[in-house]
Amino acid sequence: KILKLNNGNADHENRSTFIKYETTDGKQIVYETYKLLQCKKPILTEMDYNFKWSGSIMPKITSDLQDVINIVDEKNPDMYDKAILKFKKPLHYNQNSVLHFKAELDDVDGKSLPHVETRVTDEIDIIHYRIILKHKSETYDKNAILERCKMNSNMSSNFEKIKEIAFDKNTKSYEYHLLNPEVQYYYRITWEK
């Protein structure tokens, strides 16, 4: 599991998010997020990207568009780890930019959970999920589940199913466009490991 957060900060607005989770063998995983954001303060030089990986090995964090200046491993399963991403050039008020976060995940011990989760704290137009499972057999055809949970509830017991997402056998992937999701919810796509 990797958890991506929309921070709800007043220093920027997130208009769209594109998430890709890809594995060829079920053990080595690449998780990437692209966020279109708009600066809402006079100058923005860096951003925190909070994440939670449920595997046991700390991921390798990079970015194609920003400099990763620090990674904070909280070493606490109840807290989010953090990557600090510095823009190549400072953003000015109302300027748009794309934030890129990439995590190379090692699940060789099989401890990670098979889901991608997003916290929505502010209005956003779209969250595009693409989960590519190249290691699945030609006969695999299980649906993934899109579900949500109020942010202030006990997460483990209060997820409600929104819909099932069919597995595309040609691309070996799940793909879903979550349009204008309701604020103050966790949204999660789960699949069979």
Which residue ranges define each predicted feature?
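Lumenal/extracellular ectodomains and adaptor appendage modules
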Residues: K1-K193
